[in-house]
Design a protein with these regions (language model features):
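Short, Lys/Arg-enriched N-terminal segments with co-localized hydrophobic residues
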Residues: 11-28
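Alpha/beta enzyme core
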Residues: 115-139, 146-155, 159, 165-168, ...
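Active-site clefts of carbohydrate-active enzymes
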Residues: 313-327
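N-terminal capping/small domains of soluble enzymes
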Residues: 27-159, 163
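C-terminal helical cap(s) of enzyme catalytic domains, especially alpha/beta-barrels
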Residues: 355-380
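Short acidic/histidine-rich active-site segments
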Residues: 348-355
Length: 381
């Protein structure tokens, strides 16, 4: 009798937890919540915008059946499709077509001290993975060493994206070149669902990086892993006294187009802040319609041009959350998520804003980002 009651109680708790998980997953951020956070003027600017550049009807938008609607006719093998699906089905955004990813590669890219001193527990690899799990992320993207250190404990609990190349920041004088830190085979051995890499498009070393990453992605696909490309413009000439064109829509858009050409499955890109890099720097080739018809100065339209360069959304665009600014982090993260979603993007990859604060605050920030993608009030522009 006692064993029977215990069994019923266990079943009750299991059903209750499943119900609670479903309820929390579909809590939606209301417009009034956004207005309170961003202020009415900025909220209206982002939420009321109707894009008249590239029509949303021309885009392949994120959806719960994106494997069938977008990827089934591609050359990706069955294992790669399964791993793309594994990422898409995990976390609070699982089954929506959108993704929320925690990236923590800054210990190499920016130095461990600069990255983790604000929140000392993050020196421990396990706490990085715990934040991604408790934060309801689709995946955790971090270094070869971090994931290798905890792979046996966590590879089956959250999809791993192993970042295989980095710009180490200890050489003097500092240089900007992405070099390989790990191997594709070992990423597969530790149970990774995907590998990630960075290319500095426009840099002196970019041609070598393109060849290296293209070969790495080919092997990753052969083994059945998905591929994520950090798609950054990088050249000292791109920054002028007037503007920083590293975040220009036309230059970042072309970086995206090069990235999908080497068969990245997901593109990570900085949110565009301006446009006209080609014209201001007087190099490369562009077209006047890029500026007169395909973009405006509205951030959603600039981001949509980035999406268009990802094969009109066939390859998902995730924008980065940027550096931590302190008290304004939550508002900035929510605004970035709104811009990405309304432009036709696939999600947000937010690191420093989340991991450079106590666990509960980091989880709350990640959940707020996810709430934007779950909200029916935040629509495609």
């Amino acid at each position: 009798m006692g064993e029977h009651c215990d069994g019923k109680m266990i079943l009750f708790h299991a059903v209750y937890l499943l119900f609670l998980h479903s309820l929390l997953k579909f809590l939606k951020m209301k417009r009034e919540d956004i207005e309170k956070l961003l202020g009415e003027e900025k909220a209206n600017y982002l939420l009321n915008h109707q894009s008249k550049t590239i029509s949303k009807d021309q885009l392949h938008l994120p959806n719960k059946k994106f494997i069938d609607t977008i990827w089934k006719d591609s050359n990706r093998n069955i294992q790669t499709l399964r791993n793309l699906s594994l990422i898409a089905e995990h976390g609070r955004l699982g089954g929506t077509g959108y993704v929320s990813i925690l990236p923590v590669d800054q210990g190499i890219e920016h130095s461990a001290g600069a990255s983790f001193a604000p929140n000392v527990p993050m020196f421990d690899p396990e706490n990085i993975v715990k934040l991604a799990i408790e934060g309801g992320c689709n995946a955790v993207a971090t270094t070869y060493g971090v994931l290798g250190n905890v792979a046996r404990k966590y590879a089956h609990k959250i999809p791993f994206i192993v970042k295989v190349n980095h710009n180490e920041f200890l050489s003097y004088p500092n240089s900007y070149d992405q070099i390989m830190f790990g191997t594709i085979r070992d990423a597969w051995n530790m149970g990774a669902a995907a590998v990630g890499a960075t290319i500095y498009f426009g840099s002196e070393e970019s041609k070598r990086q393109i060849v290296e990453v293209a070969k790495a992605f080919e092997y990753a696909h052969e083994l059945g892993m998905a591929t994520v490309l950090w798609c950054y413009a990088r050249n000292a000439a791109f920054k002028t006294p007037e503007k920083d064109y590293h975040v220009s829509a036309d230059l970042t858009g072309q970086a995206n187009h090069l990235g999908v050409t080497i068969q990245a499955d997901i593109i990570k890109q900085k949110l565009p802040e301006n446009n006209g890099g080609y014209n201001a720097l007087n190099f490369g080739k562009t077209h006047k319609k890029v500026y007169s018809e395909l973009t405006t100065d509205h951030p959603i339209d600039l981001c949509r041009y980035q999406v268009a360069n990802c094969y009109m959304g066939r390859v998902g665009l995730i924008n980065s959350g940027g550096a931590s600014s302190g008290a304004t982090d939550l508002a900035e993260a929510v605004a970035t998520a709104i811009i990405n979603k309304r432009a036709g993007g696939m999600g947000l990859i937010s690191g420093r804003k989340a991991f450079q604060r106590p666990l509960k605050e980091g989880v709350a920030l990640l959940n707020s980002i996810q709430d934007v993608y779950l909200s029916k009030e935040v629509t495609i522009a």
